[in-house]
């Protein structure tokens, strides 16, 4: 998850976010990488990414977040019709200050969670390129997801890009907003 999925020049020139599905050895989706040009300085984008405990106020699927040293405890909440499905996990944070933040799964659900945020100055120096990579074991998201996957396995091709794009857009919006 550490190499950039798109050349910086391609991201900088694109008007819209870019996304790529990550497939496993059996051509099954396992995650996605997305990238976008952010109209904010790298320092501002990094400030938003680095403030992990503020994620619940910025990212709708995150209900609670606590960081102690390099250990992260997070609770996710997904509202589905009349009920809410909640999941929690612990992970380690790997930080390359000002450049990348990676969440490395330790325990809980969704299993095998991998998140990575990369901040790259735009080639023209007028913006920031934000890359978000995400992946997890989709089968650990409860009985409802298993039921949907049993009858519609093709939705895996949308769930992973949707997760990555939701994270990307939340960080972009926060970085571009005043304050």
Predicted ranges, named:
Residues 36-40, 154, 158-162:
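Soluble non-cytosolic domains of exported or imported proteins
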Residues 1-69:
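Hydrophobic ligand-binding cavity/cleft-lining segments
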Residues 25-28, 53-111, 162-179:
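Glycine-rich portal/gate segments that line the openings of hydrophobic small-molecule binding cavities
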Residues 33-36, 62-65, 87-94, 114-121, ...:
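Hydrophobic/aromatic beta-strand elements that line small-molecule binding cavities or substrate pockets
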Residues 105-159:
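Beta-strand/loop substructures that line and gate deep hydrophobic ligand-binding cavities in soluble
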Residues 35, 45, 91, 131, ...:
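Short, flexible active-site loop motifs that bind/organize anionic cofactors or intermediates
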Residues 39-43, 67-70, 92-99, 118-129:
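A short, structured loop/turn motif at beta-sheet edges
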